[in-house]
Amino acid sequence: MANSGTGAPPPLLLLPLLLLLGTGLLPASSHIETRAHAEERLLKRLFSGYNKWSRPVANISDVVLVRFGLSIAQLIDVDEKNQMMTTNVWVKQEWHDYKLRWDPGDYENVTSIRIPSELIWRPDIVLYNNADGDFAVTHLTKAHLFYDGRVQWTPPAIYKSSCSIDVTFFPFDQQNCTMKFGSWTYDKAKIDLVSMHSRVDQLDFWESGEWVIVDAVGTYNTRKYECCAEIYPDITYAFIIRRLPLFYTINLIIPCLLISCLTVLVFYLPSECGEKVTLCISVLLSLTVFLLLITEIIPSPTSLVIPLIGEYLLFTMIFVTLSIVITVFVLNVHHRSPRTHTMPAWVRRVFLDIVPRLLFMKRPSVVKDNCRRLIESMHKMANAPRFWPEPVGEPGILSDICNQGLSPAPTFCNPTDTAVETQPTCRSPPLEVPDLKTSEVEKASPCPSPGSCPPPKSSSGAPMLIKARSLSVQHVPSSQEAAEDGIRCRSRSIQYCVSQDGAASLADSKPTSSPTSLKARPSQLPVSDQASPCKCTCKEPSPVSPVTVLKAGGTKAPPQHLPLSPALTRAVEGVQYIADHLKAEDTDFSVKEDWKYVAMVIDRIFLWMFIIVCLLGTVGLFLPPWLAAC
C-alpha cells in the first residue's frame, strides 16, 4: 500500500532498461579503455630502459641529422644603443630516434603520441649570438613522436640576438641582423643540421609599427673554431629589416629643414630693419629647444657611427652660429662711414664692380644722380664770375635769357616800413637807356611815379639810345637813409647803366614793351622779378666802378668788377657755404651708400652660399639611403 501510494515503478520494469543501456555503452567504453591501455602499453615499452643521455643512433659512427627551421612571430624591438634585436620565434626541430619506433598494428593503430620533451634526447641547439638571457629554449613543450621514430619539437622562444646596427642613414636605414643556431656540444661528426626551408616562415608574423622585414634567408655554414679541432655546423638566418621613416620625417626632418630655411632668410632680411641678429638668435634658441626635445627620438649616441640626421642637426647648429657672426659683420659694414673707415681700393673693386656683376646685381643710382645735379647747380650759381666779360648788345642771347625768366629781381623790404596805400609797381624789365654823362646824373630829380623821369639828352641835345647792361641791385636802406632820401618802399631797383664813355647812369625802372628795347642780362647777385609797391625819389648814387662797356664801333672794354653791398656779399658767402656743406654731405652720403652696398653684396653672397649648402645638405641626407638601397 505504501509503494503504490508513492507511485514508484516496480523493480521488474527497471531491469530491462538497465540491460539495454549496458549493452549500448560497453563497446565505446571498451574501445576507449583499449586505446588508453594501448598508449600506456606503448609508453611503457618505449621508455623501459630508454636512456635520454645517449645519441639516438644504432652505430656510434652514425650522424644524427637534425632538420632545423625557424618561424618568426614578432619583431619586438631593435635596440640601436645596445646593438641587439629582440624577436619572438618558434624553433622547429626534427630528428629520428630509432629507439622510439613501434608498429601501429600492435597498439590499436596508434601512429603518434605527445610526450614530454624532458623524457627524450634533444639536440642541444642554441643561439650562438645571444646578447641577453638564455642561449637555449627555456620553455620545454611536448614533442610529437611518430611511429617511425620521427620526433618533431617546436618550442617558442624570445631571443635577444646581438646585431651590428648601422644608423648612418637614420631614419632611412636598413639593417641586416643575423641569428646563428647550432649545436653547442656535438660537432659535425655527431650532429649535422639540415635546413627545412631556405627562408624564415612568416605566416604567423605580427607586423611591427617601426620595422618591416624585407627578407629573411637561412644559410648552412660550417666552421672550425680555435678552441676545438672539430668542425661545427650552424644555420644562420639573416634578417634584412627596414625602418619606417614616416614618424621621423614628420617629427624630425621637416622641422630641421624649416629651421635651416629660417637661417637662410636671415641674409635676405635688409640690414636697415635692425632685426637680423634678433632673428638669428631666435632661430638658434628654437634649434636648441628642438634638440632637447628630440634626444629621445633619435638613436642614442654611440662611438661607432653618427647618424646623418645628427650630423645634419650639428651642421644646422653651426649654420645658425655662423649666420650670427656673419650678420654682426654685415651690420658693422653697413653702418660704416667716412669718419670711421676708409674704403680700400680692392674692396671697391671687388664688392662694387666684380661681384655684383657675377651675382647679377644692379645698383640703383637715381638718388645719387639727383643729389649730384643739385650740388652742381648750386656750385654753378655760387662760383659764377661777378662781372660781364662779354658784350651785351646781342639781342638773341639776351632775349633768350629774359624769356626764360633768368633775371628775376628779388624783393627785400625794411621791416620798419609799411605800405599803407597801394603804390605803383617798380620792376626791372628790359628798358631803353639814354646815353648819360656823369655830370648829368650828379643831381637827383624827383620822380613822382615810376617812369616819369625825362630822358636825358646827349651833348647835342637829342636823346640817344645805347646798348648797355642793366643790373637790378638789391639795397635795403637804413632808417637814416630812408629819412634823407624820402624813400618808403619794401625794395628799390637801381639801374646802373653804362654809357659808351664808361660812366655809370642811374635810372628808375621803367616798363616798356618796345621790341627794340634792350633786355637785361642776369648777374649772379640775388635778384627778383616780383613786383613790389614803392614810392621813391631818385637820388644820386654813390660813385661806382665802371663795368664792361661798349665803345663806339662795338668794341669791348676790359672787364671791371661791380662792387657788392655787404648784404649781397654775405648772401653769396652763405650760398657758397651751403654749396660746400651739401657737397661734403653728398660725399659722405656717397661713401655711406657704398658701404651699405658692400654690406648688401656680402649679404647676397652668403645668401646664395647658405642656399647651396642647405640644398646640398638636404640632398646628402636623403640621397645616400636610396643609393645604398639600390
From Swiss-Prot:
Residues 334-604 are cytoplasmic. Residues 434-443 have a biased composition (Basic and acidic residues). Residues 418-463, 505-526 are annotated as: Disordered. Its main location: membrane. In various regions of the central nervous system. Expressed in hippocampal neurons. Belongs to the ligand-gated ion channel (TC 1.A.9) family. Acetylcholine receptor (TC 1.A.9.1) subfamily. Alpha-4/CHRNA4 sub-subfamily. This is Neuronal acetylcholine receptor subunit alpha-4.
